[in-house]
Amino acid sequence: MASASPAIMESGTASSDEAQAAARQPAVEIAHLSKTYGALTAVDDVSFSVAEGEIFGILGPNGAGKTTTVECAIGLRSPDAGTIRLLGLDPLTQRDDVREVVGVQLQFGALPDKLKVREILDMYRSFYTEPADVGELIKVLGLTEKLGDYYKALSGGQRQRLSVALALIGNPKIAVLDEMTTGLDPQARRDTWDLIRGVRDRGVTIVLVTHFMEEAERLCDRVALIDSGRLVALDTPARLAAQARGGKQVRFVPSDRFDDRLLTSLPEVSAVQHDGQHVVVNGSGDLVNAVILQLAAAGITARDVELVSLNLEDAFVKLTGRHATEGAMS
């Protein structure tokens, strides 16, 4: 397989925080990781490292290879090629040592239906010599009133919150969280973000797998964008968004219908799309004036004109040609 070359790598002058992170021992090291299922290449020569104390995001649409990457990283799957180290440990040959330092919450984890929430927490707590404060975890995650409920009676969102608690209950040095806020309401999602920030502030390294761009922008120090099993970009959310802002985007409502070629003929315009009654134009240079003047010359008025500020989602679309909520496979 060809070696993956990220389309965007870290650039510019590193901040003092980034310099300190680079000087620390990597908590996670993945080199040339590949995994196939028959004719399907799920992970294609992916390499990255995560510094101790960093919140590192792995982003991409459903089916991009994110979950397979972390399942190989924690030893649940054997890669076809590549090396993985977690705090210097091999997750395949040093499983017991890895379990002592890594907490995991997987997207499709399941627990016994006939156990109560309290029993599950007590069972997991007993696995560790220095467990976390369970009361604090369940309070932040909104599970206090569910302690006496059976697992089978929990909603999808409640099961998700319990799985996050179980990943953190052992006071791990590395926490791997796969789609941790899927199924949560907006307030519960933000409460969970606050919890994760607090965990990181205590020195825990967080590997966060998500397709929620806002979550990555708010939480992550750096993000790896993965699409079709390949690493397409690796940088801070701010710098990835800044790359997307190398272009411009304007939205407006036209007073009358027009042929897209009216605008695509302009040198400043790279693309024209339609979003309901709005027209969305991407381009560069003096885009707004060029579009408005061209429309006016054709007798068309641009109403509700908005110059859009681009973000991490736009960076992902620019790099992959699709949104993170899209997916090719389950």
Predicted regions and their residues:
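Short, hydrophobic secondary-structure boundary micro-motifs
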Residues: 114, 136, 304, 326-328
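ABC transporter nucleotide-binding domain
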Residues: 194-282
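A generic structural signal for secondary-structure junctions
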Residues: 42, 103, 125, 129, ...
